[in-house]
Amino acid sequence: MILNHSAGLPALITRVNEGGFFDWDYMVELLENEEPFWTPGEHTGYHMMTTGWLIGELIRRITGKSLGQYFNDEVSEPYNLDYWIGLPESEVDRVAKVTPFKPSSNDKPSGFATAFRTDPDSMQKLSLTNTGKYDYNAKETYRAEIGGVGGITLSLIHISE
């Protein structure tokens, strides 16, 4: 259910405290206590932010390693990739800033975009705004192990080969 996005937790309804995305145990506890949007397994919805904690916590409980350490040990190091979940301080200056997407006035809004704009309680809106003031261009964000949206790479071509 986690890998196919049917766990029912694509976003958190419970308000995330400021800085909450940087506290692994806090985020796991929120997810453990969250009421699913649907009965797990019955529907799908993209778990863009939450998937990192859901998968990462399984990895931590099975291996004892954090998501970033596991990824480094099992993927980045063996394949000699510049790819991190939790960027080392030594690499921070290599990161390009993310620029938000700005649709053209001719673009027809997707169902996701329509829900995001019109329903403040939708999973679409909550998944992108209930983030504890997460800033994807902050150095602390680069260093955090936020698996759903925190992977940083210079090795995409190697991953796809």
Which sequence ranges carry the predicted segments?
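Short, surface-exposed loop or secondary-structure junction motifs
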Residues: 1-160
